[in-house]
Amino acid sequence: LQTIYKTKKNNPSKYLHQILGGWKESADGVIYSNWVTGDFEEREVMCYGQDFGFSNDETTLIKVSVDIPERKVWVKECFAKPNLSTSDIARLNKAYAGISLIICDNSEPRLIRELKNAGLNIKPTIKKSGSILSGVALVQDYKIIVDKNSESIIKELNNYVWKDKGTVPIDKFNHTLDAIRYAMAYLVQGKSSGIYHIR
């Protein structure tokens, strides 16, 4: 009951959808309403998240900084670009992340290996059954502060909705948001124990 009360107080939209089984207050059913724009703050708990695009889909790199006790996360878009080659991704990652840790989409092992060979500190996220919903719930539990110049993140936050008012998110407007999920799963759930996953 304490958990339910805390959810109702801190995240009423999550309470409405998950606890009461209702549709969120937003007319378009956006999944994340727990965000504002503001200045990016670098905290001790920080890494980058990356989602790989295919053809016209964007490859994204997002800087993510978390204050776990305060349940706040700061996110900043480094790039969100379609049609990138492996060398393009390596060059951009080096420019923005340097040798900092990048937690990435695990669907492209060959690409990840090539990025590692290029000198990047990159690891695939570990996905398990139900990873999308649990990852969404994790992000919903935090106040998201979005860098005001992160246009792709803001666009996706305004358009990422539940499919058919159900329990599955639509599979679009999610390239920056998936990158944020990967980074948060590592920083919040797995960093201290040496493992990371989206449960």
Where in this protein do the model-derived segments appear?
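Short, structured patches in soluble enzyme cores that scaffold and shape functional sites
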Residues: 21-23, 65, 79
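Acidic, Mg2+-coordinating catalytic module of metal-dependent nucleases/exonucleases
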Residues: 171-191
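ATPase catalytic-site recognition across NTP-hydrolyzing enzymes
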Residues: 1-50
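Gly/Thr-rich phosphate-binding beta-strand-loop-beta motif of the actin/hexokinase/Hsp70
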Residues: 42-65
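Mg2+-dependent endonuclease catalytic cores in nucleic-acid-processing enzymes, primarily RNase H-like
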Residues: 62, 70-171, 190, 196-199
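Intrinsic-disorder/low-complexity linker and hinge segments
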Residues: 38-42, 188-195
